[in-house]
Amino acid sequence: MNAISSTSAVQTVHVPLGERAYDILIGPGLIARAGTEIASRLKGRKAAIITDENVAPLYLDALVASLDAAGIVSAEVVLPAGEKTKSFEHLITVCDKVLEARVERNDCVIALGGGVIGDLSGFAAGIVRRGVRFVQVPTSLLSQVDSSVGGKTGINSPRHGKNLIGVFHQPDLVLADTDVLNTLSEREFRAGYAEVAKYGLIDKPDFFTWLEANWRSVFTGGSARIEAIAASCQAKADVVVADERENGQRALLNLGHTFGHALEAATAYDSRRLVHGEGVSIGMVLAHEFSARMNLASPDDARRVERHLREVGLPTRMSEIAGELPPAEVLMEAIAQDKKVKSGKLTFILTRGIGQSFVADDVPASEVLSFLREKHP
C-alpha cells in the first residue's frame, strides 16, 4: 500500500506509475496554491483551463490569479454544465481552444470542475498533439475520490452508452481542494459519497464500518472529511497501480456501475431524474442483492448496504427514480454494451460479503434479466 503523507492540513497520496507517477493533494486552500504546485512540477508556462458555467463564477478567477502569480499564462473555456457535455461536439470545441491557446506538450490542460469536465478535458489532453500534460482540480466529492484519479477519460455515445469513447491519460497532478465542497448541494455531496462507500464495499470492510459510524462527520467537514477522501484516493491508487489498463482487478472499481450506467442510460442522462452517484448507489444495492440471489453472499449484507446508503439519504431502489423506466429488456441492452463485456459475455462485479467483491465472468444473461424484471418498479 502506498503511504499517505501529511503536511499541515494537506494530505498527499502518491501514485507510483514510473515515469507517469503523480501526487494527489487533498486539503483546504489548494486552488490558491495551484500555480505554485503546477509550476514546481511542469516545465511549460501555458495552460488551458476547462470548466463549466456552474463552477466558473465560483473558482475560475482564483485559479487564474494563482497561475498568473506563478508566471503561467492561461486561456479559459467555459462549457455548459451537465452529463450531456460529454459529447463529440464539446470535445471538438475543447480541442480547438487548446490549440488556439498554443498549448504544447510541456504545457497543460487544467480541468476545473466535476467528473464531466475532468473526463472531457482529460480526453482532449490525451489526443491534442498526441498528448499534453494534464492537471485535475476536481470540484465535486465524486470527482475528488473517483474520476480525477486513475487516468480514465472519455465521452458518452448517445446511442450506445456512457464512457464508451475515450483514452487512458494519467494526470500529472490532482489538487483536491476540500474547501470547494462547501458549495455543493446536499444532493451532489450525497451522490459523491456513494463512491466513498464503494471503496469499503470493494475490499476495505473496516473502512465501511468506519463510515457507518462517522458519516455524519464526513458530511459536516473537517478532518473526518479529509480522512475519508484520502482513504478513498489511496484505495483507488492501489488498484490503479496494480492494473492501470483495467485488464483484471481494476474492474472492481466498477462495483455498482454496470447496473448504475444502465439506469443512467435509461434516463437519457437527465440529472433531474438521476445523477451518477445515485445510479451507483442503486447499482451497489442491486449488485449485493444479485450476489445473494446467486447464493454467493448473505442477504444480510445487501440489507446492511441498503440501510447505510438509505441512512445518508441516497436512493437504493429503481422505484425511487422519477418518471417511468424502460422495460427490463431495454436495461439489458445497455448492460450488454458495458465496457467490461468480453467476447460477448456479461461481466459483473459481485460480492461474497462486505469488502469481498470480485470480478464475475460469464454471468448468465437469463439470470440478470429475471432479476431485473423482479426489481423493476
UniProtKB/Swiss-Prot annotation:
Cofactor: Co(2+); Zn(2+); NAD(+)
Residues binding NAD(+): G115, V116, I117, G118, D119, T139, S140, K152, K162
Cofactor annotation comment: Binds 1 divalent metal cation per subunit. Can use either Co(2+) or Zn(2+).
Enzyme Commission number(s) from the entry: 4.2.3.4
GO annotation terms (biological process): amino acid biosynthetic process; aromatic amino acid family biosynthetic process; chorismate biosynthetic process
Residues reported in the UniProt entry to bind Zn(2+): E195, H257, H276
Origin superkingdom: Bacteria
Catalysed transformations (reactions): 7-phospho-2-dehydro-3-deoxy-D-arabino-heptonate = 3-dehydroquinate + phosphate
Localisation: Cytoplasm
Associated pathway: Metabolic intermediate biosynthesis; chorismate biosynthesis; chorismate from D-erythrose 4-phosphate and phosphoenolpyruvate: step 2/7
Main location: cytoplasm
Keywords: Amino-acid biosynthesis, Aromatic amino acid biosynthesis, Cobalt, Cytoplasm, Lyase, Metal-binding, NAD, Nucleotide-binding, Zinc
InterPro entries, A to Z: Dehydroquinate_synthase, DHQ_synth_AroB, DHQ_synth_fam, DHQS/DOIS_N, DHQS_C
Annotated Gene Ontology cellular component terms: cytoplasm
GO molecular function (one): 3-dehydroquinate synthase activity
Pfam families per UniProt: DHQ_synthase (PF01761), DHQS_C (PF24621)
Known function: Catalyzes the conversion of 3-deoxy-D-arabino-heptulosonate 7-phosphate (DAHP) to dehydroquinate (DHQ).
Matching PANTHER family: 3-DEHYDROQUINATE SYNTHASE, 3-DEHYDROQUINATE SYNTHASE, CHLOROPLASTIC
HAMAP family from the UniProt entry: DHQ_synthase
Family label: Belongs to the sugar phosphate cyclases superfamily. Dehydroquinate synthase family.
Protein name as catalogued: 3-dehydroquinate synthase
Classification of source organism: Bacteria, Pseudomonadati, Pseudomonadota, Alphaproteobacteria, Hyphomicrobiales
This protein's encoding gene: aroB
